[in-house]
Structures are given as C-alpha cells and as structure tokens.
Amino acid sequence: MNKNFLIAGGVVLAIGLAVAIGVTLVDEPLDGNLPEGETTVNGDFLPEFASENDDNIARGLTAPTFSAPNQNSEIVTIEKNGNAKALIFLAHWCGYCQKEVPVVQQYVDLIGVPDGIDLIAVATSIDRARDNYPPHDWLANEGWTETQLYDLDKEIATAYGLNAFPYWVFLDKDLNVVARRTGNLPQDQVGQLLVALANQ
C-alpha cells in the first residue's frame, strides 16, 4: 500500500476523532448538578457600580425585574410584591463572599430579617473549575435559609451593574435603588442597612 496513502488516512482519522471529541465537549451541558431554567430580565439596566461615595447616579432609579431558577429549578420572579428587597450577589469561588455568607446568616439566625424585606442571594459568575462548586452545595453547607437564585449566564449581574463581589443592592418596595455596596460588610452594618430599608 502506498505510504503517502497511509499517512493521509491517519491524518483524516485523527481529524475525525478531534472533531468528534470537540463536538462532545461543545454539546456537553454546563453541569447536571446546576439548577435549570430560563433567566429573563425586564427593564432598564442600572449603571455599573463605581464606589459607595459616587453612587448617586443609581440612587432612585428603578431596578429591572427578573426571573431565575432557585436551587430546586423552580422559577422565581423578583418584582413588586409590597416588600423591599436586599439582594446579595455572590460568586462561589470568591473568598470575600465565603466570609460574608456566614456573617449574614448569623444575623438572620440571631435577629431575623425585618418584616417587609425579601433577602435574596443571587449566585452568579458560576465556574465549575473553581472553589465551592456547585454554589447551591456551598450555600447549603453554610445553612443559608433565605431565597437563593441562580444567574447562570450573568444576565442579572450585568443588569444590576455588578463589578465586584460580594455586591449588595437595596431596593425599596417600588424597586427603586436605595443603596449599593461592595465588599465584606460587618454584621452591624448589614443590620443597619436592613433596618433602614424596612423604615423606607
């Protein structure tokens, strides 16, 4: 048999295997352990957060409504329901987020979320190659008792102006921005912000 024919055949076979493997990798779902469901965002996006001292640009703006899956793949919609909202955007691989979650949960356990406030964790920037994946296992291990939603494609984070973790957005009952914060908040500051929000 012609040597060149054998070489050409081997090249074709190698390419075919590479294509087959490539298709398998591309078609593989993100992860079977992640919640499933469509995320939708409606309304004008908030400007990207710059700093606490320079955030007047967002204060008073109406935040977009959104729907996303919870840890049980049930679609939850965040919209006007008569309650104010405290949203904390978390990345499972973020060390600051890993410190913040138990601080917030301890406050909830000891004092409780004030009446009239929905406290919502939004897991975003999900990466199965990094620490604490999947995020719902991490939150379960931390004993998180409040609503948890999954921003699988970072659509909600983008719409809310996230640029660092952890990222807090406080909304009044009409979904207008009251305050935004980034970084670890001490437990007393978390409490002050929640109480102030309840008194809006």
Report residues per predicted region.
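A short beta-strand-turn-helix
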Residues: 57-58, 65-86
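Short active-site neighborhood of thiol/selenol oxidoreductases, capturing the structured segment around
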Residues: 76-98, 104
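Hydrophobic beta-strand anchors of alpha/beta hydrolase catalytic cores
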Residues: 86-87, 119, 168
